[in-house]
């Protein structure tokens, strides 16, 4: 009987050992997400709401950059600004305060055609329905309307065949405008800043999604929770991430958006990170989100 050498015993089985997987920012094993396949035709659109009642969590930044990344992959994308602050419109360089026709007119005036409100952006394949402060009066005007929760869905119907995705940037509330978005969407993406108070609000939001699904839109599903503004250097962020994964599991996107000074720069420039800094880590992260969203919706 030949004794094994010390070097052989250190290998612990050698060839048959599973290699230690590389971990992603979520703490789960990193996986390769395939790029979306090329399309041979476009439409009908899948409508996605970017939704969180807490402000400052990266909804608008994520809407712009997810839309731009999808357009890079050959998708036709329409972004809808549903926030009276008009940050989505401004972030794409559209002078929204000067416009006569916006999403407000679509909601309150059935004679307004959506084709009159769509603006081309500087990104090929990416269009926008803008908003401005006029939208703040929409909920008051709609409150007594029959089918008031379906107004946005009716307005979008004529262009459903023209786009692959329609992404709605919701305002930071769970009022009638947000309910309109959820009522016409197939999916919801919930961006959340990686900090404790953002985590606390997720239960209320998921409860609202459940109520809309039960009462207005049986097809509504949560596509995923997108962690944004993650600072891997801080213990707090890592602890919150661990808790989010513990509570929501596979609902959390593998793709994580880290904190960077690049995003304020793109807001001033009026263009997405994918064109402003195409080789940056942030641009690659949003391409990952786009690939993962397409993958999840195809299941």
What annotation goes with each model-predicted range?
Residues 1-299:
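P-loop NTP-binding core
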């Amino acid at each position: 009987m030949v004794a094994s050498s010390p070097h052989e015993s250190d290998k612990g089985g050698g060839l048959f050992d599973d290699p230690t997987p590389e971990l992603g920012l979520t703490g789960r094993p990193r996986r390769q997400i395939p790029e979306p396949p090329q399309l041979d035709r476009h439409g009908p659109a899948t409508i996605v709401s970017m939704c969180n009642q807490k402000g400052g969590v990266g909804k608008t930044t994520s809407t712009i950059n997810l839309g731009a990344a999808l357009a890079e992959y050959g998708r036709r994308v329409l972004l809808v600004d549903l926030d009276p602050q008009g940050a989505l419109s401004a972030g794409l360089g559209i002078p929204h305060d000067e416009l006569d026709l916006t999403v407000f007119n679509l909601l309150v005036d059935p004679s307004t055609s959506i084709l009159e409100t769509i603006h081309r952006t500087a990104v090929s394949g990416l269009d926008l329905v803008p908003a401005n402060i006029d939208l703040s009066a929409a909920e008051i005007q709609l409150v007594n309307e029959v089918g008031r929760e379906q107004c946005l869905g009716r307005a979008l119907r004529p262009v459903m065949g023209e786009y692959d995705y329609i992404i709605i940037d919701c305002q930071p509330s769970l009022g009638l405008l947000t309910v309109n978005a959820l009522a016409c969407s197939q999916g919801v993406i919930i961006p959340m800043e990686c900090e404790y108070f953002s985590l606390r609000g997720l239960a209320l939001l998921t409860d609202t999604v459940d109520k809309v699904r039960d009462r207005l839109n049986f097809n509504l599903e949560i596509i995923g929770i997108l962690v944004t503004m993650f600072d891997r250097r801080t213990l707090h962020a890592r602890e919150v991430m661990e808790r989010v994964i513990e509570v929501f599991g596979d609902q959390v996107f593998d793709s994580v958006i880290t904190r960077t000074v690049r995003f304020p720069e793109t807001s001033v420039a009026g263009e997405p990170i994918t064109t402003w800094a195409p080789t940056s880590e942030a641009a690659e992260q949003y391409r990952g989100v786009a690939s993962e969203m397409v993958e999840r919706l195809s299941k």
